[in-house]
Structures are given as C-alpha cells and as structure tokens.
C-alpha cells in the first residue's frame, strides 16, 4: 500500500490525503479554483476523484435511454446501475453493478441475496444492502397483493411468481403453506419451517393443526430447493402424501405441492405424483 503523503500548507499540494471519495459535495460539484502554478495537478488525481464528468455524463445518458426506450434498452447490470446511482450518489456504480450480477447471477439473485452476502461485494456497505433488501421487500409485497383476496386457483401464475420471488434465492430450504378458505381465497401465507441446504423438517400434525386454527378448508404446500433444481425427491413425494392423508381426515384439501428452484418450478400435481 502506498504511503499517505504528509499534510502540507503549500498551495501547490493537492487538498486530498486519501484515495477514497470525499464526502463533501462541494469537492465534486463546486467550482474549486485551480492553482495556475500547478496545471497538471488535476491529472495527478486518482480516477475516482478526477471530477464528476467521467461518470455523470454516463449517468445522464443511461437515464435518457431508460426514459426514452424503457427497460428493454438496458442490460440487467445497467438497470441495477441506475438504481445504485441514488443509493451511492458520488461514485462510479457501473463496476459495483457488474460485480453484483457476477456474484449472484441475475437481478433476482441480487435482490434475493441475504444482506450479509451483499456486503461482501466491494462497494456495497450495510446501508446499500439494507436499501436493496427494502426494494426486494416492496417487490414481494406487490406480488403478494396480486393474490390476496382473490381465488388463488384462478390466479395461478401470480401464485407462482410470488412464491418464486419469495423463495427461489433462499440459501436454505424453507417450507411454506398457503392457507385457503372454502372459496379458495388466501387466508394466510406462513413459513412453517426452515432447514439446511437440502432438508427442512415438516410435521404433518402441525400443518393440519394450523389449518384448523385458521379455519382453512384447503392448503397449498410450497418449498424451495437451494440447489436450483426443483425436481422432487422421493422424500418430498412421500411427505406430501402423508400430509394429504392427515388433512383428508379433517376435510382439508391439499391442492398441490410446488417446489421452487432458481430457474423454474415443479408442481407435484402437474406431474401426477399426487
């Protein structure tokens, strides 16, 4: 690491003692007078401090493309870059956006990643990670609103979209239940268990007990495969059949068991496994 230059009162020295961006906006947007005796002083600055024009012009061009042509004109990393403009206002966010996509594979992967993993990407601090998770939460709530107070079976694509957004990028298995009333309208959406990377414990008695507590007459089982492959295991199929039998004794219908992966989903009913 290069040794920091000592502070000096000479007008010929640059007023920066670090390679990190300066917090004061005036150093970026104010008209700092140049020392006429040091015409090359600006060139000696690190690229990150060489003035706003090296990325602010790019920001405006990117905004214009989005404004005029919509999201189809931008790559995923550029959409993320646009968002990061506001979260990290005085820094070139293009490398950060690309690093996030490279690390997590896609936009949905970025927003589905835990905050702790987001902060492992250079340039992403705790506040930025929190903001990204907040945006992710807004998206989840929006998708959930599409199935709330509606007949779930007639809004099946919305159900799949919501479950995928909520679970596809979880790093551990999660078992979720959608509880429905006699009109198949959503009563509650609850996570019943969280497990390891390849297993989560499920207790049929607890599933049925909770359905009775909510006066649900039907349920949809959902769980994720962190590996990304939604293919059901023998254990998945057997466990589903046990829950179906336990629920049937109390006139509760199990409509389906959906398995969510990063790139798709599987319906056990669709595969005629139940």
Curated annotation (Swiss-Prot):
Transmembrane segments: none annotated. Keywords: Hydrolase, Metal-binding, Metalloprotease, Protease, Zinc. One of its GO terms (molecular function) is metallopeptidase activity. Zn(2+) binds at residues 223, 225, 236. Residues 152-274 form the MPN domain. GO terms for biological process: proteolysis. It comes from the Bacteria. This is UPF0758 protein RHECIAT_CH0001935. The lineage of its organism: Bacteria, Pseudomonadati, Pseudomonadota, Alphaproteobacteria, Hyphomicrobiales.
């Amino acid at each position: 690491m290069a040794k920091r230059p000592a502070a000096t009162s000479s007008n010929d020295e640059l007023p920066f003692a670090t390679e990190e961006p300066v917090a004061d906006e005036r150093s970026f947007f104010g008209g700092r007078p140049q020392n006429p005796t040091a015409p090359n002083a600006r060139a000696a600055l690190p690229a990150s401090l060489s003035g706003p024009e090296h990325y602010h012009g790019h920001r405006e061009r990117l905004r214009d493309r989005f404004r005029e042509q919509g999201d189809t004109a931008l790559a995923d990393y550029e959409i993320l870059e646009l968002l990061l403009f506001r979260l990290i206002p005085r820094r070139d966010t293009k490398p950060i956006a690309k690093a996030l996509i490279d690390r997590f594979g896609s936009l949905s992967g970025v927003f589905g990643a835990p905050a702790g993993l987001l902060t492992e990407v250079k340039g992403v601090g705790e506040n930025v990670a929190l903001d990204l998770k907040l945006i992710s939460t807004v998206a989840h709530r929006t998708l959930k609103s599409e199935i709330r107070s509606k007949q779930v079976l007639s809004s099946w694509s919305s159900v799949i979209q919501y479950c995928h957004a909520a679970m596809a990028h979880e790093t551990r298995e999660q078992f979720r239940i959608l509880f429905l009333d006699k009109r198949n309208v959503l009563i509650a959406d609850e996570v019943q268990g969280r497990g390891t990377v390849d297993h989560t414990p499920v207790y049929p008695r607890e599933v049925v007990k909770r359905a009775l507590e909510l006066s649900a007459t039907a349920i949809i089982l959902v769980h994720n495969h962190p590996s990304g492959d939604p293919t059901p295991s023998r254990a998945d199929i057997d466990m589903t059949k046990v829950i179906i039998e336990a629920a049937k004794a109390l006139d509760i219908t199990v409509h389906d068991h959906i398995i969510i992966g990063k790139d798709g989903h599987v319906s056990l009913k669709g595969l005629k496994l139940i």
